Amino acid sequence: MDTAKGINIIVNNPGKTIADYLDPSTLPSRNPGAFLILCPTTTGTGSEMTFASVIHFMDTDRKLSVGDGTAFANLAIVDPVLTVELPKDVTAYTGLDALTHCVGCLTSIYNVNPLSEALARDGIGIIMENLPKVVANPSDLEA
């Protein structure tokens, strides 16, 4: 998904390189971008819902976040069936990634508000209840 988002940034902003988007506030996109459909096959990152993507810069062997308005998906298709055959450790680790996003929201010094706090608390509860279930039984689509 991040590769598709990075490509959408570059294709829709001619004359720039992906490195120009390391600080998305400096180059706000005026282009709508191509219609972008993202379909996650793991849980945790939330990349299908953000303007950021993590790109591996091979010249420095570093993974860095880049962002732009053209990286937002027009449509996100989230189908839990796609996660059923993940190895249990990947299911656990990506579930923990989702948990850290919720905790990060609660502990952030930026833009915490009653809605984000309520959603983060709810997310923590859902993850704590369901992550052990889905690791034990990946076919449990309710978890």
Predicted regions: what they are:
Residues 1-78:
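Glycine/threonine-rich beta-strand-loop-alpha-helix active-site module
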Residues 52-143:
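Carboxylate- and glycine-rich phosphate/diphosphate-binding segment that chelates Mg2+/Mn2+
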